Swiss-Prot record:
Residues 61-87 are annotated as: Disordered. Residues 214-333 are annotated as: 6 X 20 AA approximate tandem repeats. Its main location: other. Involved in formation of a polar tube through which the infectious agent is passed on to the host cell. The keyword Electron transport does not apply. Residues 74-87 have a biased composition (Polar residues). O-mannosylated. O-mannosylation has functional significance for the ability of microsporidia to invade their host cells. Glycans are attached at N79, N225, N245, N265, N285, N305, N325, N344. It is found in: Spore polar tube. Keywords: Glycoprotein, Repeat, Signal, Sporulation. This is Polar tube protein 1. Residues 1-22 form the signal peptide. Sequence repeats lie at residues 214-233, 234-253, 254-273, 274-293, 294-313, 314-333.
Length: 453
């Protein structure tokens, strides 16, 4: 539709040139987001006017200072509104995104205006915006410097190759010599790691004793792990006999199922690993001070959680009888569906799930007859307060007792247009936001909360 209102401030130009968009929702959408929604909606850029939207102050627009640009609205023969904004004290109105064809766009709609190319500098960025939203800025270009690859500090010539090893890091293969890791050079006279008769020599790292340190898996026959100070590798199933782990101080790796007999974990001070199902008899967790892991279904009899001060894990469905949560002071986990009756979570009584009153939509929506199929009020619902929708309409605002404090003007300018695009958006300053049905409450009286009495 051609006669769509267009109110653009200098900050919106910066937004278009810099392609600054934000997906931060201004208000929580209590309706199905897959429904068709208006392509844009006008709201006031007043912090107090939208603070209570969906009871979510964190989504409120809180500028550091008001924008002072203003101009006078008007219409032409095409029933289009000239680019303008109206400064209403602390309530500066910014608007509006629209679609060329109703329902044809699935991406944020562009303003219906051609803006000539011009350099964008920090001096043009004047509107106050949400602190968490990105603002246009001058980006300094950092020259790309070529990364210099340092050559190897030592190259072992072929004449110096020690039997059993390669200097180039190539893994050993049956019938071939072993390998030296990058940066590692074996001392003269060093030989291969521990061997099992009839097998290929394995790999040894610096600090290991030739002929004593075990080989890597698949090397040395028994598949034991090779260790160096501070590193340990767990045995794989079927390796090293019982499959137990080799450990060094401060490091532990848990046994895998079928290893170490019962499959219990090896623990050292400060570290614990939970048993897997079928390990350790009942499958309960091994715990040490300050650490806990939750039981899995079918473990520990009732499947209850072991808890320590400050930590709690919820029971899984079918555990502990009714599946209620175990709680400790300050922590709660919600019940799962089918638990504790209706399965709703609560921060009320510990150890049981109770129903929570559903928070109604804080916005007083029009009667059902005035709500369109997309969950938004129909345009005719607001005719009484907004006048004819589409072009900008001047509406008289009742005199406020706080007018002397805020310097509010008696006239406001706003407009709304719905073209059934998937996502409604609103432009505030130089950023674009997604909005939900709740934002329509601001249209009925956009500056109700501008005053601080």
């Amino acid at each position: 539709m051609k006669g769509i209102s267009k109110i653009l401030s200098a900050s919106i130009m910066v937004m278009k040139l810099g392609n600054v968009y934000s997906a931060v929702p201004l208000c929580s959408n209590t309706y199905d987001p897959s429904q068709q929604q208006p392509s844009y909606v006008l709201i006031p850029s007043t912090p107090e006017a939208i603070t209570n939207c969906a009871y979510s102050p964190k989504n409120a627009y809180v500028p550091s200072s008001p924008t002072t640009s203003s101009s006078t609205p008007g219409t032409n023969n095409d029933n289009e509104t000239s680019p303008t904004t109206e400064d209403v004290g602390t309530c500066k109105i910014s608007v509006v995104k629209h679609c060329d064809t109703p329902g044809a766009s699935s991406t944020p709609c562009e303003p219906e205006q051609t803006i000539p190319a011009q350099p964008v500098t920090m001096a043009t960025v004047t509107p106050a915006i949400i602190a968490s939203v990105q603002t246009p800025s001058v980006v300094s270009v950092i020259p790309v410097t070529q990364k210099v690859i340092q050559p190897a500090t030592m190259i072992v010539p072929p004449s110096s190759i020690i039997p059993g090893y390669y200097p180039n890091g190539t893994p050993a293969a049956p019938g071939q010599q072993g390998q030296i890791l990058s940066g590692s050079v074996l001392a003269p006279g060093a030989s291969s790691c521990q061997l099992v008769p009839g097998n290929t020599p394995g790999q040894m790292l610096p600090g290991m004793t030739p002929g004593v340190s075990p080989c890597l898996p698949t090397q040395g026959g028994d598949g034991s792990n090779q260790t160096i100070p501070g590193i340990v590798y767990p045995c794989q199933p079927g390796q090293g006999g019982s499959g137990s782990n080799q450990t060094i101080p401060g490091v532990i790796s848990p046994c895998q199922p079928g290893q170490g007999g019962s499959g219990s974990n090896q623990t050292i001070p400060g570290i614990v690993y939970p048993c897997q199902p079928g390990q350790g008899g009942s499958g309960s967790n091994q715990t040490i001070p300050g650490v806990i892991s939750p039981c899995q279904p079918g473990q520990g009899g009732s499947g209850s959680n072991q808890t320590i001060p400050g930590i709690v894990y919820p029971c899984q469905p079918g555990q502990n009888g009714d599946g209620s949560n175990q709680t400790i002071p300050g922590v709660i986990s919600p019940c799962q569906p089918g638990q504790g009756g209706n399965g709703n979570g609560t921060t009320g009584q510990p150890g049981q799930c109770v129903s929570v009153p559903q928070t109604p939509n804080p916005i007083a929506m029009p009667p059902i007859s005035g709500i369109s199929g997309n969950g938004y009020p129909t345009s005719t619902t607001y005719t009484q307060s907004l006048g004819q929708l589409g072009p900008c309409i001047d509406v008289q605002k009742p005199t406020s007792s706080c007018e002397s404090q805020t310097n509010e003007k008696s006239t406001m300018q706003y407009a709304m247009e719905a073209c059934a695009a998937p996502t409604p958006t609103v432009v505030i300053g130089n950023s674009e936001y997604l909005v939900g049905p709740g934002m329509y409450s601001s249209l009925t009286s956009p500056c109700n909360s501008c005053c601080q009495c």
